[in-house]
Every structure is written in structure tokens, then in C-alpha cells.
Amino acid sequence: MQFIDQARITVRAGRGGDGIMAFRREKYVPAGGPSGGDGGNGGNVVLEADGNLQTLLDFKYKRLFPAPDGRRGGPNRCTGASGKDLIIKVPCGTEVRHLYTGILLGDLTRSEDLLVVAFGGRGGLGNAHYLSNRNRAPEKFTEGRDGEEWFLQLELKLLAEVGIIGLPNAGKSTLISVLSAARPKIADYPFTTLVPNLGVVRRPSGDGTVFADIPGLIAGAAQGAGLGHDFLRHIERTRLLIHVLDGGAEDPVEDLLVVEKELVAYGHDLVERPRLLVLNKQELLDEQHQDQLVDALQAASGRSLILISAAMGLGLEGLLAQVWKELGV
């Protein structure tokens, strides 16, 4: 399934039905009064979070969403039927903004959360509404009002507690695959991961914690280089970051600083987020080189370092123990 995390749509609420002019014309009612009914209200457009959806793919092919109009009023003071609300399903984690102003309308984070994004127009008034002591046969009635129409920006931010970040080819996808049931595409070249991968890792209590493998960052990502900040947004909601470094890289210390710089540049307090620093591919290092590299990375980051080999399954229990400690599990 194609992963789409941004969409632009137009929502158009229903128009209110017109009121009508009518008079009672019944046998034995020689002085029948006004009986024109009011129009029904137009339908609203409502977004609903659906926990079964993972992408905004549906909005790639359909972008206009009109709600039904209200029906016109009827004789005998009958009010027209109101238009049904149009319910649009979106994934949990969807932010909704006005397209041109950027104003945040809502953030649908839990399944069945609802957000009315366009209100239907009010129905018009029938002439029965204008009956008064001075005017016993009013001919006035009003048309229904137009519903609201808005251009919206939908933006999906994954609901993961733990985000796995690092430069391309650091081993993030391998790590999430061995920690969870996720099976991301894995190969030895940059940008294998082109979309975020989600995996559920079991806590000691048996409950699941969602981990997200975020596509590799590069220098300038916060300004849009490489895969850009299209996927940086997906770590905004995380409680903990796991920064994976490639132990076989030419200069892991420089790699560390590149990602640190991008987190600072992107903002949203990401650089202040609790973070575990992980050196992957431990099997590629001899003891002397490993000790030197650990000292250099800890000095550059001010953090302790966790050594693992995701491919060989080394150090994973210790890593998870630190994850649960940081999350307070």
C-alpha cells in the first residue's frame, strides 16, 4: 500500500433548503392562513479518526467532498429534511489546517475523534414563520443559506512512542525488524527506507509499544534536502528517540553531529527529546577501535552509548531495558 502523509482537499457543506410560501386551502377552512414550511439545514462535513487507516492515500484520487443539501419546506408547515452529515474517515494522527492561513483546526489522535470542518447552511423560513397580528397572510419567505466551503491541508503524523533515527544505512530498518514483527525493505544502499515503518514491540507487561523507523536523514534535511522534512514530522509525537549510528561508517562522530544539527534546525524541541545513542554493527569493530570510538562518541554527545549488532542480535535486551526505563514502563 502506498504511504501518503499529506493531502489537500476541498470540503463543501450542504446548502440549506428554501422556505416556501403556501396557504391552507382545505374544505371547511374558508380563511386558511399561511402554511409554508421552513427548509431543512444543509449537512455538515465531519472528519472522523479511524484506527484502521494508516495513510491518506484515499485523498490522492478524490479531493472534493460535498455534503448533501437540505430539502425545501413543504405545505402544512412541514419542515424540509436536513441533509445528512458527510463523514470522512482519516487515520489517527491527522492534523487539519486551513490551506491558505495555516490555522490549525484540529488534531485527531484517537480513534473515533470527530472534527466538524464545514457547517451546513441554515434552512430558509417559510411564510408561516412571518404570521403576525398585523399580517395574517404573509407572502414573505426566505431561501436557504449556502454551506461553508473550505480548502484544507491534511497532514499525518505517526503515533509512535519511540522513533528510530539516523543517517541512511545505519541499520534502523534491521533494528525495527528484529525488535518487532515489522518487515521493512532492507538493503545495503542509502534510502532503502522511503517511507516510515511501524513496528509493535512488546513491553514486559505484554502491552505493545509502537516504534517508528524514520527514513534516513542527511545534512540539510530540515531545509528539505534528500527526503527532507517530509518525515521529520513523524517524530514530533514520540516520547523517546533512538539515534542509531553505523559502527562501520568512515566517521561516526561526524555522522552524530550531522543528525544533531538537523534536529536543532527542524525545531519542535526535538533536540530536547529524551534520546538513546546506539552504535550498531558492533561486529565490525575490533576491541581497540571500539573503545576509542565509544570514548569519542560519548565525549561529542555527552551521552552514554549502547553497543548493539542488530543483524546478529547482540545487545538488544540491554537496549530494550533502557527504552522501558526511559518510558517509565
From Swiss-Prot:
Mg(2+) binds at S173, T193. Coiled coil: none annotated. Its EC number is 3.6.5.-. Keywords: ATP-binding, Cytoplasm, GTP-binding, Hydrolase, Magnesium, Metal-binding, Nucleotide-binding. It is found in: Cytoplasm. Residues 1-159 form the Obg domain. The keyword Transmembrane helix does not apply. Residues 160-328 form the OBG-type G domain. Transmembrane segments: none annotated. It comes from the Bacteria. The keyword tRNA processing does not apply. GO terms for cellular component: cytoplasm. GO terms for molecular function: ATP binding; GTP binding; GTPase activity; magnesium ion binding. GO terms for biological process: ribosome biogenesis. CDD domains: Obg (cd01898). An essential GTPase which binds GTP, GDP and possibly (p)ppGpp with moderate affinity, with high nucleotide exchange rates and a fairly low GTP hydrolysis rate. Plays a role in control of the cell cycle, stress response, ribosome biogenesis and in those bacteria that undergo differentiation, in morphogenesis control. Belongs to the TRAFAC class OBG-HflX-like GTPase superfamily. OBG GTPase family. Monomer. This is GTPase Obg. It comes from Prochlorococcus marinus (strain MIT 9313). The gene is obg.
